[in-house]
């Protein structure tokens, strides 16, 4: 089956059988081809997809992906990926055969250890929690466990990322918001990462930074975050697209 690398050594714990994986893959292709995905705030992305063979409704912002395009993209996608930390001893490879634990990201509330109060998280909380996860051997990565709600919203992600890098040597996640400033803030975060490792050359050799953005329910993407990820990919940095909708919580 296209898109799933076969290994000689299979994981000890498997959730899905090969038939189940085939069924999920086929159903995903069908949804992408027949229903499509809405991409808002992304006129340039829509044009790019149209030029590369996708069926685009510019009025609705809906893109339908012929299955052969998806299959070809899956073939070209790297089957392994290295997560880099500031300290190389914390590097690890994502290869489908190993499981690693990391913290969640951007939680907005914290239980105050002094008072027991449930309150909005702060930069101080983020720094302290990052140091805890840095010390715990059970976590392979972390650093963006909560967010600095005591900082201005338009630059909060910069405080978050700088705090993460200053308090862990492990791989750490990052994100950009608000979306209308995504490209500009990404440039600033690249500067922060460059300062952390010493030079642009070192950052490209060991990219401790990468794009992370989430899908929206139902079947939507914010084009501004897609543009950000494309920018990072062209620079040689990996990108992580997460399926954020949760049944019963965010799914409409």
Q: What residue ranges belong to the model's regions?
A:
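Acidic/polar, glycine-rich intrinsically disordered N-terminal extensions of enzymes
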Residues: 1-124
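Helix-rich catalytic cores of soluble enzyme domains
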Residues: 120-252
């Amino acid at each position: 089956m296209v898109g799933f690398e076969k290994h000689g050594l299979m994981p000890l714990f498997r959730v899905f059988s090969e038939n189940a994986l085939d069924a999920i893959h086929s159903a995903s292709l069908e949804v992408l081809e027949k229903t499509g995905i809405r991409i808002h705030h992304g006129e340039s992305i829509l044009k790019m997809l149209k030029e590369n063979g996708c069926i685009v409704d510019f009025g609705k912002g809906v893109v339908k992906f012929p299955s052969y395009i998806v299959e070809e993209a899956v073939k070209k996608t790297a089957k392994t990926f290295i997560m880099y930390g500031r300290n190389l001893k914390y590097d690890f490879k994502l290869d489908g055969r190993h499981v690693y634990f990391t913290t969640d990201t951007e939680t907005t509330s914290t239980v105050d250890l002094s008072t027991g109060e449930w309150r909005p998280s702060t930069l101080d909380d983020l720094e302290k929690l990052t140091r805890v996860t840095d010390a715990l051997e059970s976590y392979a990565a972390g650093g963006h466990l909560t967010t600095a709600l005591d900082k201005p919203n338009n630059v909060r992600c910069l405080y978050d990322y700088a705090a993460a890098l200053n308090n862990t040597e492990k791989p750490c996640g990052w994100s950009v918001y608000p979306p209308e400033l995504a490209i500009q803030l990404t440039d600033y975060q690249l500067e922060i990462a460059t300062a952390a490792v010493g030079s642009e050359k070192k950052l490209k050799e060991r990219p401790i930074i990468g794009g992370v953005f989430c899908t929206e329910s139902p079947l939507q993407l914010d084009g501004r975050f897609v543009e950000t990820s494309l920018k990072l990919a062209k620079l040689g940095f990996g990108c992580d697209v997460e399926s954020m909708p949760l049944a019963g919580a965010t799914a409409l």
